[in-house]
Amino acid sequence: MSSRPLLKLALSLHDRLDELCSRGQIALVGYGLDVAAVAAVARHECFPIVDDEEVIARLNESTEILERSCRGSTMIYGVHTGFGGSADTRPDDSSGLGRGLMQLLQTGVLVVENLNISGPSTPQIMMPQSMPSSWTKATTAVRINQCVRGHSAIRHQTVKSLLKLVATQITPIVPLRGSISASGDLMPLSYIAGTLEGSPDIYVTKGSGKSAKIISAHEALGEIGMKPLLLGPREGLGLVNGTATSAATASLAVLDAIQLTLLSTGLTCLVSEGMAARVEWLHPFIAETRPHPGQGEVAAIMRAFLKGSRLVSGLEGEANAHLHTLNVRPDEGLPQDRYPLRTSPQWLGPQFEDLLLAHSQITIELNSTSDNPLTNLKTGAMHHGGNFQATSITSAVEKIRTSLQMVGKLLFSQCTEMINHQMNAGLPPNLAADDPSASFCCKGLDINIAAYQSELSYLSNSISNHVQSAEMHNQAVNSLAFLSTRYTIKAIELLGMMVAGVLYAACQAMDLRVMHATFLDTTTSTLQKAIADLLPNGFKSDDVEKSLATAVQGLRNAWWNNAGSDASERCSITAIAFVQVLCDPSKYHTDTHKEDICLDLTAKEMRQLQDDVRLHLSKAYHKHHSAFLEKPTTEEYIGKGSKALYLWTRQDLGIPMNRGLIDHPSPENLKEPGSVGKRTIGSYVSMIYQGIQDGRLFKRFATASREVGLGDGGVNGTRKRAYADYETP
């Protein structure tokens, strides 16, 4: 097994999606369908095709078997019977059964806003009552793939009609609620079947983007020159009696969840650098002694992303250890990082493993037959069973949703620690770049992320234990797979918001860490050179030099430990601490060494020296502060993988370091009439969120993963192995 299976799977799916988008179409043959292909159809206008002669032959053979069975004495469900708990009825004319099935299923709620038709408005409706078009497109593609396996007795003509709907951008408007995913997703699929029938009361979206319009299915078929389809024996049931809606939306969910979880792993690296973490907890030995594959994979990814960082310490085998002379945190406090960082591999690892299993379950479902009864092409027999029960999808998406909550909890804990100056190893309160009494920068983000995590935790509760008996107690157990998938997609949206907020805060924290660390580095150097001139006459230079090393460290600690003070007060406190240690090293450490020299100053001389040092610090800090805000140097000090995510934020999106109150937008700071000017923090976080939603951030993560040597995961290697078990008819 690969040592990085989730990352390699994600890179493989990412490459596969790019490949399909450039190709523009996907051949459906009943097996080999992956979640990337579903996403390509749903989100990127990639059209499914069915042109394989063997597939067409399977469809023809399946319908011939059904026709022969109908002519015989065998009782076939849905052909000679009613449906569900009413299957004890025996209709005299089975030709109307398909229409009767559509009538009983097309019962979902849609409001006039969904349909763009005249009627009283419903301003109290907060959310649309219809499925997103992308879900419906994905559902159609998945149902086609399930049907072309040849077990549902669907005609080739019917499949071609479904394909034409997608190709001509006719997307049925499907109610969001009403499926219990027991006998498949009956209600959603019935609206797709109703579109094929040309129902004047089923509505569709024709076209995409600004050119899209809402018309009836009857009008839409007329516009593309397609006749309404008269469903053949059992075809109505064959179209609706499956798990396609659950499987399709679960495919989108697992793809997004895998990417968000990997992004959260990379984001933990940024937080570690912002917090100047002591990352010995990433040593391979720790994972080797507890060999859960997910834990080892997380640690390996993080080690690779942090390689070369001058903001963290403790990476094993550092070839550039001599570079780690930058003082990035106080040398007091906890000797180990708190659990949100130190145990992140142990926390994220099980989520990696669950996502791999969920992906496997969903991929199998995409390439399975879900219907009843089934046609056996080898024997010609009809088999009655329950392959429509979508519990495998429920199992998958509930694992995904639980994993999302766990990832969110980790990010929430990391973020609130990073923003809190009493826990973040020397960064200012709320990650404010100016005086903490004037600016509260990321405090609102802390509140937002708590809100997102609360909702995410609520959504993570199991759906499957809320099953209600339905349909004359015939469907007494039902999977609720589509319902669970809907809530999983909501959870993905929330975690995406959290990732966006934490990424914004982490970039700010890294900037501040570098700004203060480089200030101390340059200032203590100049201070050491200037100290002889600041001291009263009569002190030997040798004595001063012996005291300086300890005093400088005392100065650095005082600076980090007083991050909650405004700059003027911080400089004053730091100057006092420096002079105190210079005069008496025991003020800094109790185990005073013989070589430590105590400089004997009078009280007046001490006050004068403190004032001189304070003035030196104040001038140096304000000069350094202004220069850094003008041109941050953060990228020179961070790990290669972290740098990719940092630069994506700072350069690709153009989101600058927050300078404090000066960056709050107001009419006065518009550069020119009509310009946007400065942005709120929320606007910047929204830009990041949009980049997460449209895949740009993960694309950068994928590139960075390869740049740091984490494997290619190419479509010709990993993908073939990942799906080897499923690529059989």
Curated annotation (Swiss-Prot):
Residues where (E)-cinnamate binds: 241, 336, 342, 372, 443, 471, 474
UniProt GO molecular function: phenylalanine ammonia-lyase activity
Location of cross-link 5-imidazolinone (Ala-Gly): 182-184
Cross-referenced InterPro entries: Aromatic_Lyase, Fumarase/histidase_N, L-Aspartase-like, Phe/His_NH3-lyase_AS, Phe_NH3-lyase, Phe_NH3-lyase_shielding_dom_sf
Catalytic site positions: 77
GO cellular component: a single term: cytoplasm
Major enzyme class: lyase
Keywords associated with the record: Cytoplasm, Lyase, Phenylalanine catabolism, Phenylpropanoid metabolism
Official protein name in the record: Phenylalanine ammonia-lyase
Organism: Phoma sp. (strain ATCC 20986 / MF5453)
The gene coding this protein: M7
